[in-house]
Amino acid sequence: MKLGIVGLPNVGKSTLFNAITQAGAESANYPFCTIDPNVGMVAVPDERLQPLTDLYHAKKTTPAVVEFVDIAGLVRGASKGEGLGNKFLSHIREVDAIVHVVRCFDNENIVHVEGSVDPARDIETINLELILADIEHLERRLERTRKAAKADKKLLVDVDILEKLKAHLEEGKTARTFEGFGEDEDVDRVIGESDLLSAKKVIYAANMDEEGFTGNDTENERLKAVQAIADAEGAMVLPICAKLEEDIAGMDADEKEMFLSELGLHESGLDRLIKVCYDLLGLMSYLTAGEQEVRAWTIAKGTKAPQAAGKIHTDFERGFIRAEVINYKDLIELGSLAAAREKGLVRSEGKEYVMQDGDVVLFRFNV
């Protein structure tokens, strides 16, 4: 899973990225300090891994990972190449979903490119640049499809959808709010094939003031403005304090727990962000366990056993025989796989088995 962190300059993008990856991406107080995207691999928090590691005395523990990309800031006119617009847009095209950092904090030492803090305006600015780029992209596809439809009448369905979609975008609306998207097979296919930037799923990371941050300040007017936009387009909002997260990132586990407790928080904003992104894309993890390694594997919800096996190695999918599956909680409660077998809790599942989150699996295959 690859997530792009986007936002206008000086909204806290690189500060958030620093906290996520502890990679120390430069976070200077001027536009375009992150000219090339910084990439960081981040573990998906999973409290099941350590108990499994202890149970098997595993030599290695490997969590599922999320790839975060810190993408250079953009300004008005990015779709026409202003600032670093062209680079920005091409980098967004490569990600699975967008974490849009929106400035909701005051700091007179950090200059906002528009001269004031207005999250609704900032969201509109970035969405508009994505929409304008999509319109240009769509016009070329529509022209090609119209020509092809003269010989293949089946493509008239695509032409109709593309024309309506173009009109929708020209009203300043994102592709993800287009009627039928996520519900109609033809609409989903056409939008998917069009590779539209404004169709990507979004989490608005509302970057709040450090002072008095609770992670759930529902009365904050700027947060309300972000929430209203998210509600209108079916997006998600996560209040976060990037500066606070950057401070926490340098702490050891005990310090971190104590610090969060003092703030009245159960987990860091980064852990919440990663989990929300995971859920947003409809992903889950299954687990493999043995003396050599305990590992979490990322798959889409609804994945069947052979395709899940293919995540480990293509041979596993090609030569799939069966999956030996046990529920994680049952395995931990009984204390060993042998005890679980005695209780009849290890199931033998075939090619049609739909994997469940937290399945502990041993795949049998032959090639």
Task: List each model region and its residues.
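Conserved Switch II/interswitch segment of TRAFAC-class P-loop GTPases
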Residues: 40-45, 72-82, 93-155, 168-184, ...
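Amphipathic alpha-helical transducer elements in NTP-driven molecular machines
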Residues: 32, 46-49, 62-68, 82-96, ...
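Short, intrinsically disordered, mixed-charge
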Residues: 22, 54, 90, 128, ...
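Conserved G1/Walker A P-loop phosphate-binding module
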Residues: 1-111, 139-140, 144
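C-terminal-of-GTPase-core extension/linker across diverse P-loop GTPases
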Residues: 2-6, 17, 144-354, 361, ...
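A generic, residue-level signal for flexible/boundary positions that often mark functional hotspots
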Residues: 5, 21-29, 36-38, 43-46, ...
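Short capping/connector residues at structural and topological boundaries
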Residues: 6, 32, 37-40, 47-49, ...
